[in-house]
């Protein structure tokens, strides 16, 4: 229920529980949308920068909304939704997001010279270390791998998500010159740690 409240910004969801002696009512409303969702997921962590990066875009009837931030954590937290339905196994929207994120973040780290100075090869896992992301797409006629809708398989979604993320993240990098340097240092550090662990 909380996920739905975050995904539908400013919509109040009311849950009435009359089972006990004292009836309970819970009202959920979040004005910040998925950006507030990322902050909620990252409570207790130290973000690399604030507020989270957020992007909205659409193409061919498919709308994409994403919010993401990196923290001092070493784990990736990725939540994907299609028409407010969660996909625990990701799918084409996740594939498009990861491709764009890896290309943009690692491209910046390479072009800034940080990766070359440290002499490390960057991977997608390095770019996603410490990442918390909520990705929500609205698709007119989505196709899923099963009735449980755990994985989106609509092939037209991948290039749309890839394009939106590439454009918006690239634009964010240009408008915020300090944050990409901090992020690149974290990515290179993750790559160096991965290489050291492999050699050990």
Language-model segment annotations:
Residues 2-200:
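GHKL-family ATPase ATP-binding module
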């Amino acid at each position: 229920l909380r996920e739905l409240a975050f995904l539908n910004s400013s919509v109040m969801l009311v849950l009435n529980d009359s089972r006990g002696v004292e009836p309970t009512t819970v009202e959920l409303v979040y004005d910040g949308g998925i950006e507030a969702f990322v902050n909620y997921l990252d409570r207790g962590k130290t973000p690399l920068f604030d507020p989270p990066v957020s992007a909205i875009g659409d193409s061919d009837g498919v709308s994409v909304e994403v919010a993401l931030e990196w923290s001092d954590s070493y784990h990736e937290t990725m939540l994907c939704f299609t028409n407010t339905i969660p996909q625990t196994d990701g799918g084409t929207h996740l594939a498009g997001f990861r491709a764009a994120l890896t290309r943009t973040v690692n491209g910046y780290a390479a072009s800034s010279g940080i990766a070359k100075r440290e002499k490390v090869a960057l991977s997608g896992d390095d770019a996603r270390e410490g990442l918390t992301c909520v990705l929500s797409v609205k698709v007119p006629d989505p196709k899923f791998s099963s009735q449980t809708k755990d994985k989106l398989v609509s092939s037209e979604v991948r290039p749309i998500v890839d394009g939106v993320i590439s454009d918006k993240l690239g634009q964010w990098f240009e408008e915020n010159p300090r944050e990409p340097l901090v992020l690149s240092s974290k990515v290179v550090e993750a790559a160096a740690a991965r290489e050291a662990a492999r050699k050990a």
